[in-house]
Amino acid sequence: MTSDNQKDAIINAVNTASDAWKSAFNTGDAAGCACQYEDNAVMRADPFGTFTGIEEIQAFWQNLINDGFSDVEYVQPSIEVIDASSAVLKSGWKMNKAHGVIHKELWVIQDDGTAKLREDHFEAQG
């Protein structure tokens, strides 16, 4: 069982990492986006495909940034703590040229107490 203090720490770590990802994207820093993922993370970006590992994930975000996408915001995000070392974030999202839904961001607490994405499944709907 996860204590309230553990849950708060996990939620804080996820919020900090998620904010860092959004800030990196909005400033055109694809490497900053990619460093929020674990080395072997899997990102499923519907309808674009599945990307595995930091290199593929960074290339995906760099492509979007190069195409002029920016200003990402999460709409009504929710975070559910799964266990003592992970949580799932779900949310709507919007940016200047697209919008959609985050079906599952699996954030895992690292040895240093920070959170990184192990799984990222989102969908562009327009």
Role assignments for model-derived ranges:
Residues T2-G32, V42-G126:
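A beta-strand edge to alpha-helix "cap/lid" segment located at domain peripheries
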